[in-house]
Swiss-Prot record:
HAMAP family from the UniProt entry: ATP_synth_b_bprime
Biased composition (Polar residues): 1-13
Keyword Cell inner membrane found: yes
InterPro entries registered for this protein in UniProt: ATP_synth_b/b'su_bac/chlpt, ATP_synthase_B_chain
Membrane topology, as annotated: Single-pass membrane protein
Assembly: F-type ATPases have 2 components, F(1) - the catalytic core - and F(0) - the membrane proton channel. F(1) has five subunits: alpha(3), beta(3), gamma(1), delta(1), epsilon(1). F(0) has three main subunits: a(1), b(2) and c(10-14). The alpha and beta chains form an alternating ring which encloses part of the gamma chain. F(1) is attached to F(0) by a central stalk formed by the gamma and epsilon chains, while a peripheral stalk is formed by the delta and b chains.
Protein's name in the database: ATP synthase subunit b 2
Length: 187
């Protein structure tokens, strides 16, 4: 309701009471409007069903085909990766087995070499020990032989010094032998 307050002119926008109503609400044209709606919807249905729906259906089918193709490709890649993983695990197990076999073989070889070297060293040491024992025994025998002669000479000198007479050599030898053996022989 806009009114102009200008002098001399007045404009009204209201509809006077005898004029027709808004056409969609007019009861006289209601039946023709329903027929127009039915024709418009039928025409819209035909246009949509003949042109729009086939295009949308084609797009949907194309998209479904693309999705199925992508899923099949993804499954193929997954199967391929599963096969590669199994092959990797098989090769890894085989490599582990080979490594253990090589390690065992190396350990056995080194143990055999070590045993052979140890036995050779033991034989060498045994030979050296036997030689050393023989040398010691020979030296002891030689030393004991010298001890007997020295003891006999010393005993003879002592007895001669104390008694003033030369003792019997056989008697001194028996006394020295008895003394060296650890026994006492009264002479």
């Amino acid at each position: 309701m806009a009114e102009s307050h200008a002098t001399g002119t007045t404009t009204h926008t209201e509809v006077p009471h005898g004029k027709p109503e808004f056409p969609p609400f007019n009861k006289d044209t209601f039946a023709s409007q329903l027929v127009s709606f039915a024709i418009a919807f039928a025409l819209l249905y035909v246009i949509v069903s003949r042109f729009a729906l086939p295009r949308v259906g084609g797009v949907i089918k194309t998209r479904e085909g693309t999705i199925e193709k992508d899923l099949a490709e993804a499954q193929a890649f997954r199967d391929e990766s599963d096969l590669a993983l199994k092959a990797y695990e098989t090769e890894l197990a085989a490599a582990r087995t080979r490594a253990q076999a090589i390690g065992s073989e190396t350990r056995d070889t080194l143990a055999a070499q070590s045993d052979a070297e140890r036995k050779a060293v033991e034989l060498s040491l045994s030979a050296k020990l036997a030689e050393a024992e023989k040398t010691i025994s020979d030296m002891r025998t030689k030393a004991m032989g010298n001890v007997k002669a020295i003891a006999a000479d010393a005993t003879s000198a002592i007895v001669q010094q104390l008694s003033g007479t030369a003792p019997d050599a056989q008697l001194i030898d028996r006394a020295v032998d008895a003394s060296l053996k650890g026994g006492r022989d009264a002479a």
